[in-house]
């Protein structure tokens, strides 16, 4: 990670850390870096979620892009994976998404995609950062004839929706589905897509006001959806996050089916169909021990990466795997798209239910999840979270807790890639053991580097 770019682009509190001035610089310098080798006039696609700051930041970002002669195509409100898909499909030079994903409305972010539809390599991000920090802006300043133009490209949203529907390879007639669009980027598209696929829908979290994105709805708050599934007697619930690159499901009994279980269900189906590349699923260190035991039982190999869907994608590209993801609900189907896609994942999950004739609870029952607890400890600043593992007291308590587990469980303490948080996670055979381990570590972390 660089000075401005984290694991998922540039993020911060809108109009405080991520200002219009910074958005302009990211547009100007990012656009320049990404279009240096274009033979024709470069074109860049821009999308955003429903945050109130999105229009402000989009205006500044687009101005920066136009100032270096780039043709900008404004997609308006669209899911992050929609931007990635359209950039690659249409042969655009790059794409930019304005979103802070599952974060609250006060935050926002700017994320770049290259012309291949993948998130930017670290080298390109560092190149952009160097231009931002340069003492003088020496980039070309074209006169009227060399400036870029802005085009509305709402048709792009419809193209993305049409693509999603093709991946269903049929319809979902007869299925009763609760959708939770998190008052976010999928608030119109998800209803349109699943209605066209003939599912009977109940939709929550589809009334964004600029401030309510991810508030008590969406993949990070599936409780309201779970309640609605039980109330309506639906077959399942499907919750996306603010930019719709994640999916968390709920079965017909209102039980949460997280990314690990969804990956197992879809991965096993792909294996049985001979469509799981190298019989391998790529996941991160956050995936549950029970998930890995289920994979082993099913004959599926696993490759483990650092936390972050970008690292999952890097591993998949490097070794030609086609399916991977995270417990948090990012799932990447490289046969279809270049990044995590919540709506695509939902369609694939429903497809498995349709083809097997099984309920979601039946499919999910093959994975026995070990008790897990995750606590996010807010620390003083980003420097504190990065140096946390060098603090002797924190090292000592982790070592003591690992010894107490006697090899029957695991502990993972890591910094958030996007916020000043230290994530403390443990898994063990019993809830009591997990509670004790996590609470003990959290107490020390808060005492040493927590916000007082």
From Swiss-Prot:
Q: What class of enzyme is it?
A: isomerase
Q: What is its EC number?
A: 5.4.2.10
The record places the active site at 101
Q: How is the cofactor bound?
A: Binds 1 Mg(2+) ion per subunit.
Q: Which GO terms describe its molecular function?
A: magnesium ion binding; phosphoglucosamine mutase activity; phosphomannomutase activity
Identify which cofactors the protein needs according to its UniProt entry. Answer: Mg(2+)
Q: Which PROSITE patterns match?
A: PGM_PMM
Q: Which GO terms describe its cellular component?
A: cytosol
Q: How is it modified after translation?
A: Activated by phosphorylation.
GO terms (BP aspect): carbohydrate metabolic process; peptidoglycan biosynthetic process; UDP-N-acetylglucosamine biosynthetic process
Query: What catalytic reaction does the record list?
Result: alpha-D-glucosamine 1-phosphate = D-glucosamine 6-phosphate
Question: Would the keyword Metal-binding turn up in this protein's UniProt record?
Answer: yes
Ordered alphabetically, the record's keywords are: Isomerase, Magnesium, Metal-binding, Phosphoprotein
- Where in this chain does the entry annotate a coiled-coil region? none
Question: Does the keyword Lipid metabolism belong to this entry?
Answer: no
Residues binding Mg(2+) are 101, 241, 243, 245
Q: Which residues carry this modification: Phosphoserine?
A: 101
Q: What does this protein do?
A: Catalyzes the conversion of glucosamine-6-phosphate to glucosamine-1-phosphate.
Q: Which family does it belong to?
A: Belongs to the phosphohexose mutase family.
Query: What name is this protein filed under?
Result: Phosphoglucosamine mutase
Record organism: Lactococcus lactis subsp. cremoris (strain SK11)
The organism's lineage is: Bacteria, Bacillati, Bacillota, Bacilli, Lactobacillales
Q: Which gene encodes it?
A: glmM
